[in-house]
Amino acid sequence: MNRNWLRSLTILAWAACGLAHADILIGQTADFSGPVASGVKETAAGAKLWIDRVNANGGINGEPITLVSMDDKFEPANAAANARELITRKKVVALFLTRGTPHNQAILPLLSEYGVPLIAPSTGAMVLHKPVNPWVFNVRASYQHEANRAIRHLSLVGLSHIGIVQVNDSFGSDAVKGAQEAFTQVNGTPLFTETYDREKPDFTKIQAAVTSQNPQAILFLGSGSAVVNGVRAIRATGSHAQIVTLSNNASDGFIKALGDNATGTIVTQVFPYERSLASPLVKEARQLQKAATGDDRVTPAMLEGFAGAKVLVEGLRRAGKQPTREKLRDALETLRRYDIGGLEVSFSPTSHSGLDYTDLSIIGSDGKFTR
């Protein structure tokens, strides 16, 4: 009897020990094999820099953080299915760095249904900013803010014949609102606005518009390989229009895919210059990258993941031991001017935007972003 009792006690002790030091599971669904895979992998690598650093120092109250990533191939239906599995079967505490506007929209109903926070979604969709969703915590500026700045910049440098090319999904229809607002602010109108199908991009109509209208610049609202192929189609018409696209394409993979069409392309950015040692955020990321790989070079996409991981970790720290989904959400609400390295992140019951930093970069002849 005593032997059985002791055996049971030992099992319970091991179980308690395992519970006390169980991994904190964080879920991610994103495109790891489709048209935006290169940027997704860079963003995840940036997040891993900070998560690995935290785990090496004991994790959160002795509990390591594990990022559970699933490939949705950039399909909204897959993103929703992955998110449901992460929430219901993997029992993640939060979702993190989910990529894509329609993909995040597909996930939104699950957040309130299961009471799960979504931290640092890798999209600037306004629907995640306004109205405030109590379960969504953004760590980057909106696409509308980026598109607005891009058009105002083009106007400032004297370009008025500006065309717009946009994908025909919720990302395109969201981002174009920022461009339209900017045209109103500078008393201008777009030379043309053309759309293309996200599933089966065909740029024939866009080539015709470029040929007939001869734009000085084109704001291209799309993602990854579609933008690469669209720019190739535009250049095939003989057009030398200035190409501008948004931060969702701010990755090394995008530059490489553009090939000979990369140089001179303007890409909006939502984090500081990745080669600037004046930015504490960049400096820290570069130091950790060098320690991990021997090379201190980081990319804008990596900085997005790095910044998001800093906010995630701080939320977990404030949530206390064995953080729950609700504790984490409540903890994130307490972030006020939280310094992640020269940038301050703030959340409140009336604002979950976190940051509104935007900048412009241009791809140089060396195949790197410059500012």
Predicted feature residues:
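Periplasmic-binding protein-like
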Residues: L86, K90-R99, I119-P121, G163-Q166, ...
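Extracellular/periplasmic Venus flytrap/periplasmic-binding protein
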Residues: A81, A125-V127, P134-G238, E274-Q287
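Segments of small-molecule ligand-sensing domains
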Residues: A291-M302, V313-F369
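Extracellular/periplasmic periplasmic-binding protein-like sensory domains
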Residues: V231-G305, G367-T370
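Extracytoplasmic "Venus flytrap"
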Residues: G27-K48, M70-A77, R99-P102, V165-S173, ...
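Beta-alpha junction/loop-to-helix N-cap segments that form part of ligand/metal-binding clefts
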Residues: L25, S38-A45, N57-V127, D197-F203, ...
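Sec/Tat signal peptide C-region and signal peptidase I cleavage site
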Residues: C17-A22
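Bacterial N-terminal signal peptides that target proteins for export
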Residues: M1-L9
